[in-house]
Amino acid sequence: MISITHDRPLGDINTFRMQVSCCLFIEYDRATDLKDLDFENIPKPVKHIGSGSNLLFTGNFKGTILHSKMDFIEKLSDNLFSVGAGVGFDRFSEFAAREGLWGSENLSLIPGEVGAAAVQNIGAYGVEV
């Protein structure tokens, strides 16, 4: 499902709690939802964000914000999982520990979501994703 909001305040989705807004805010809960969007006719630039832990807005964002609500963890085999981009690292770390998978425990309490791992370094205490 896609949710589209115009002129949405962003204070609740950035860790600095900056009271700014964006022209268009789109949340989705399936990756296939994105192919249904008309990217030619939405305000530019387009930014894809997670929990906003690495964002500092200094003013209103004149473009479109995409935000994943894909919040699932699926066990595919003993050591293979499918994890939604919107799953928080703390939740994933707790899940992995319950499953007996070692190594992700140092990711607990890291602000951010799993989807960020594709584009930035995420780690603490000598453990990196």
What positions do the PLM features span?
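Anion-binding (especially nucleotide phosphate/pyrophosphate-binding) glycine-rich loop
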Residues: I2-V129
